[in-house]
């Protein structure tokens, strides 16, 4: 059951169903229009605020590639749920917001730019490590489709199973076929057994990251 607008969330909710919380934050509210931001923008906003400690709305808008109006709405919704607070010095995460960020980081556990040619899908390529995500990977089609919807040119999904890095539908052992590519990923992200990695490419680095986030969310 989702909470009503204007009502904060419990620590248990922040530490539990954070994927459902993201969906709720992006939901349209009658009678107004649907917000111009999505779950990936909320995730990126939380990361940017957590990393900065405190940040102004204009700077956050630039970091997200959104207009200030959209960022104002996003921050209002985060504040309504007790996840952020705003002062003249900028906005910051509350203790509840920081708890949520740590929970997110426990699943979306690593990010890296990928320069390995075999794994490149665009001018800029971003890889995200999803802890425990391999169990939800079939052939990587769902991840690719979500990445493309987010603006990326494409995506490839890798999994670590039985100690081998694989690309479902392409190779069961990347190390034997493309050792330099496998080494690059293992060193950059350090996946463990049962983890998944999504790599997305785009002409713009922020779009590549949004594509990777959209793909990664299918594995949560």
Task: Give the role of each language-model region.
Residues 1-21:
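Short, intrinsically disordered or compositionally biased N-terminal tails of bacterial proteins
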Residues 65-77:
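Short amphipathic alpha-helical interaction segments
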Residues 16-43:
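Short alpha-helical segments that sit at the start of domains
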Residues 39-55:
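Short amphipathic alpha-helical interface segments
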Residues 53-64:
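Short acidic, hydrophobic short linear motifs in intrinsically disordered regions
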């Amino acid at each position: 059951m989702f909470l009503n607008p204007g009502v904060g969330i419990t620590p248990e909710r922040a530490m539990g169903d954070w994927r459902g919380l993201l969906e709720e934050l992006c939901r349209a509210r009658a009678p107004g229009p649907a917000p111009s931001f999505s779950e990936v923008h909320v995730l990126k906003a939380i990361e940017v605020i957590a990393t900065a400690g405190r940040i102004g709305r204009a700077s956050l808008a630039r970091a997200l590639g959104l207009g200030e109006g959209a960022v104002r709405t996003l921050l209002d919704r985060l504040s309504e749920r007790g996840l952020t607070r705003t002062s003249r010095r900028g906005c910051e995460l509350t203790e509840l917001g920081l708890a949520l960020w740590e929970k997110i980081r426990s699943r979306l556990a690593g990010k890296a730019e990928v320069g390995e040619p075999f794994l490149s899908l665009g001018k800029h390529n971003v890889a995200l490590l999803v802890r425990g995500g391999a169990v939800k990977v079939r052939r990587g089609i769902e991840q690719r489709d979500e990445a493309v919807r987010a603006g990326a040119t494409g995506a490839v999904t890798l999994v670590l199973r039985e100690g081998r890095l694989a690309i479902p539908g392409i190779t069961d052992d990347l190390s034997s076929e493309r050792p330099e590519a496998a080494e690059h990923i293992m060193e950059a992200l350090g996946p463990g057994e049962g983890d998944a990695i999504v790599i997305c490419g785009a002409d713009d680095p922020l779009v590549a990251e949004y594509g990777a986030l959209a793909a990664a969310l299918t594995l949560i």
